[in-house]
Design a protein with these regions (language model features):
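Preference for solvent-exposed, low-hydrophobicity sequence contexts
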Residues: 52, 93, 606-728, 795, ...
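Short alpha-helical "recognition helix" segments of helix-turn-helix
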Residues: 752-764
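Recognition helix of helix-turn-helix/homeodomain-like DNA-binding domains
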Residues: 763-787
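Signature of the SF2 helicase/ATPase Hel1-core->accessory helical subdomain module
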Residues: 252-369, 381, 575-589, 594-598
């Protein structure tokens, strides 16, 4: 272990280092905060406690997750430096004559140049040898030879870059801050400062979060500041062999911190036995944990890893499950009791710590208020409805009309329990075409009544019970809605200026906006009200007040776990109250479990409260809801299989995911499909692979009568046809498609498979995989051009197309032009759709203006209500688009 006294552990060494410097985000010191000091101590105390250590970190929330993630990455980077066993002698011994190296010359060793390592000599007259001698001979071609004595060997670093030039071009002179950090903070001698480090940590986190941290993270010491990327090489990996470096890494040495957005890529990096020894894995963020759930157990249990940390907000859906799964894991959980025992006032007030302390206050001072309203649908009636639904679902009698009956009846009850508007008002907006893809409740009632007429006698009684209850609810809420009245009264009384109203479905947003804007007492208030679905709730915002219109939970919102406000109110009917209180009891039980598991002692006063209704009744209703949700997924796949094509296994496609939208439509996604997902923060559209789509995502499709499912392609073709783009773009569009046309024609004529094409390209020296060829061919993948020019050249060579080979550079450049305009179209779509949603229709650029009307004609915007990942097949004509299951 370099730079430490022999008795020091890694923990002691890193603790000493953190005492000698401040860790900052955008110049704001964060490492002096009491909670973050306790957190750093937890990480360092568990990092090397055993040969294999697992830690679960449940921090205060998304708004301040960067503070926790920063310190975790800092601990990883510093521990890698200190675990490093590579000495100068090891570096020199690894060199072979002919290897490229960098040599850092001068007293401060801050300037590097490229050389060829020739070998060792004992005198200037000796021929070089691979046996270690007194001098090293470096050759720099025209610039001559250099002989180095042993005292200068520490300035030699293997060079793994692609530059063939033997000089210092493109290599920036170091500013000396790296050396100062290693000496002043880590206590190393000049000769101990490593140029190469032989261990790495793999980190799973989003590219956006990684950029946010690494672009802002600095250390302050001795009146200097230095970034983490100046101390150790760090790279982001989109695939195991696709690396994008952060900062400067002139020798192109292996990264010490390897970041990726996917657990599958992290697995590949960890299994790679060449190069550095991987000592740790960190998975940061609820989405990263949730998406990698199936692959994480294998990695967490890898005994070769010194440490594994999973970090997520304490309010996340995954937190309880992960802590429960790993009973021996060390736990750092920011429960209310933990914070009361360990939190002290802010050490420094700045932008970062203020957010952290606001989130801490939101946990400690959080007050959840329930407004319980009377309703004709009481608990007994609600139970009767659920039991009748379960009875019909469980009967062996199976028809499409039975499936439709269950789906529509379930949706109607959900509407009646959560609506904060009258049914009359809702149906008026539907009649006025202000709500698209929403069926009027009275039409649904008529439909399920007609479906029930086809049922056998054994089901008719239960069906009548369901219909009668729904008709009572329909009439009860037709003219007036108790939740609407309670919501308005609450808003009239509150002094809050930033409010979130959480609703279950996206179409509620427009309804609620209209309802509130038409109220004279509310419309002129100076406040900001965000109306969001539970699946689109942004926990990184901090609100004065959050109002949930019912016992609503989603992928990104849970009333009891939410840390985005001190004040949360749930407006409930009596039938919802019992499930809500059961959830409260469950939440308190989980908090008690986390306090008991905490690595830092926590006192709490947990008592198991009694309920005013039979717990088994509530459990039965919850079980029915769970089984009905599973039933809906199976109904969707079964419905689309009722076709002649599927029966004969003709024209079928493999699917990897089934999504259900807030329109009650579904979509079946194939492996290579990339969805156009609305990014309301960036005001643009992102292309998201099928396996990365999550609940709450808003996806933009073309309308079902379009010839192409790619809305960007449709709009671009339309703009070309109507002369709305320049002649250069028209020419580029034609040229950009040529490589793909040549490849498809060649494969059709020769019967070549993607694997055969990949093998031919590999033989010719171009690294490519079978799935890459498949994604080129798949129009759903939206591939405009290959990533590298030589791929187009290889396609031309394989197909024997000399003209394409001669014009490969033009074809590649044309692809760049089209890629750029596609990105502009995506941004324009995002701006236009967000303008529709927010009412701000300001056109920000000419393309937005050009396509605004066309988007309204071409686009369908839906929100993912739920998504499940499968391995199945469906008819080809039902993939990658929203369809109704009739």
């Amino acid at each position: 272990m370099n730079g430490c006294d022999e008795v020091d552990t890694i923990r002691d060494a890193v603790e000493k280092a953190l005492q000698k410097c401040d860790v900052c985000m955008a110049g704001n010191i964060i490492s002096r905060e009491g909670l973050l000091r306790a957190y750093s101590d937890f990480v360092l105390s568990t990092m090397e406690k055993e040969k294999h250590n697992v830690g679960m970190i449940l921090h205060t929330g998304s708004a301040c997750s960067a503070c926790f993630d920063v310190l975790l990455i800092v601990c990883a980077a510093l521990s890698n430096i200190l675990y490093n066993q590579t000495a100068t002698d090891d570096v020199i011994a690894s060199l072979t004559p002919g290897d490229k190296v960098l040599y850092y010359s001068g007293k401060e060793k801050t300037r590097a140049q490229r050389y060829t390592f020739c070998g060792f000599v004992n005198s200037y007259d000796d021929p070089p040898s691979d046996k270690i001698g007194e001098l090293i001979l470096l050759d720099q071609g025209k610039n001559g030879k250099t002989y180095l004595m042993k005292k200068n060997w520490s300035g030699i670093v293997p060079y793994f870059g692609e530059s063939a030039s033997l000089d210092g071009k493109g290599i920036r002179k170091e500013n000396g801050k790296r050396k100062s950090f290693f000496c002043d903070v880590l206590g190393m001698k000049d000769s101990e400062i490593p140029r190469t480090i032989d261990t790495s940590t793999v980190v799973v986190m989003s590219k956006e979060d990684a950029d946010n941290i690494l672009n802002r993270l600095t250390f302050w010491f001795s009146n200097m500041k230095v970034g983490l990327t100046e101390l150790v090489p760090i790279s982001y990996y989109t695939d195991a062999d696709q690396e994008y470096p952060y900062g400067n890494n002139p020798a192109k040495t292996e990264p010490v911190i390897k970041i990726t957005g996917k657990v599958s890529v992290a697995r590949s990096l960890l299994l790679d036995r060449s190069g550095n020894r991987n000592i740790g894995l960190m998975v940061l963020g609820d989405e990263a944990v949730r998406r990698g759930e199936s692959e994480l157990p294998e990695l967490i249990e890898r005994k070769s890893l010194q440490y594994v940390y999973l970090s997520m907000p304490i309010g996340s859906e995954s937190s309880e499950k992960m802590v429960d799964c790993y009973s021996s894991a060390a736990v750092f959980a920011c429960t209310k009791d933990f914070l009361l025992c360990n939190y002290v006032n802010a050490a420094i007030s700045n932008q970062e710590t203020d957010i952290l302390n606001a989130q801490i206050d939101a946990i400690i001072d959080k007050e959840i208020t329930t407004i319980v309203l009377p309703s004709l649908i009481n608990w007994e009636t609600y139970k009767e409805f659920k039991n009748a639904m379960y009875f019909i679902k469980s009967e062996e009698y199976s028809t499409d009309k039975k499936d439709e009956f269950i789906i529509h009846a379930y949706s109607l009850m959900k509407l009646f329990m959560t609506a904060a508007f009258s049914i009359r008002y809702m149906e008026k907006l539907i009649d006025d075409s202000e709500l698209e893809n929403v069926i009027k409740p009275d039409e649904r009632l008529t439909q399920i009544t007609e479906y029930s007429h086809t049922f056998p006698d054994c089901l008719k009684s239960k069906a009548e019970t369901i219909i009668n209850i729904l008709e009572i609810a329909y009439l009860s809420f037709f003219d007036k809605n108790p939740k609407e009245k309670a919501l308005k009264e609450l808003l009239e009384k509150t002094s809050a200026t930033h409010i979130a109203i959480v609703v279950p479905k996206a179409y509620y947003i427009k309804l609620m906006q209209r309802v509130l804007s038409e109220d004279e007492k509310l419309c002129n208030r100076d406040w900001r009200i965000d109306i969001v679905t539970a699946n689109r709730f942004d926990n990184s915002n901090m609100y004065d007040l959050i109002i949930a219109i019912g016992n609503i939970t989603g992928n990104r919102f849970d009333i009891l776990r939410c840390q985005a406000s001190k004040n949360i109110t749930a407006i409930l009917y009596e039938a919802e109250k019992h499930q809500f209180h059961r959830n409260e009891k469950r939440f308190k039980s989980v908090e008690h479990m986390l306090n008991q598991r905490s690595a830092i002692h926590v006192d709490d006063d947990y008592e198991n409260e009694s309920s005013d209704v039979d717990e088994s009744e509530i459990a039965t209703v919850e079980k029915i809801d769970d089984e009905l949700s599973e039933y809906f997924d199976s109904v969707a796949i079964k419905a689309v299989r009722n076709s002649a094509d599927y029966a004969s296994r003709r024209n079928v496609a493999d699917i990897v995911a089934v999504a259900k939208f807030d329109t009650d439509e579904v979509a079946f996604f194939t492996k290579n499909y990339k969805a156009y997902v609305l990014d309301d923060l960036e005001h643009t559209i992102k292309e998201v692979p099928a396996d990365s789509i999550v609940e709450g995502d808003t996806i933009v499709f073309t309308r079902s009568n379009s010839r192409t499912r790619d809305i960007v392609e449709k709009l671009l073709r339309d703009m070309i046809t109507n002369n709305l783009v320049s002649d250069n773009v028209k020419v580029a569009y034609k040229q950009s498609r040529r490589w793909k046309t040549v490849l498809i024609d060649y494969m059709n004529n020769t019967g070549s498979t993607p694997v055969e094409i990949a093998n031919q390209m590999i033989k010719n020296g171009v690294t490519v995989q079978e799935h890459t060829i498949k994604s080129w061919l798949d129009e759903e993948a939206h591939t405009v051009r290959p990533k590298k020019l030589d791929s187009i050249q290889q396609i031309a060579l394989i197909a024997g197309d000399e003209d394409l080979f001669d014009h490969a550079e033009e074809c590649f450049a044309a692809g760049g032009v089209i890629y750029k305009i596609r990105r502009q179209i995506l941004t324009a779509i995002g701006q236009t759709i967000l303008g529709e949603i927010t009412g701000n229709d300001e056109q920000l650029n000419p393309i937005t203006t050009t396509i605004a009307d066309r988007i309204k004609e071409s686009a369908v915007v839906v929100q993912v209500e739920s998504i499940s990942f499968v391995n199945d097949t469906v008819p080809l004509n039902s993939i990658n688009r929203p369809i109704s299951i009739d």
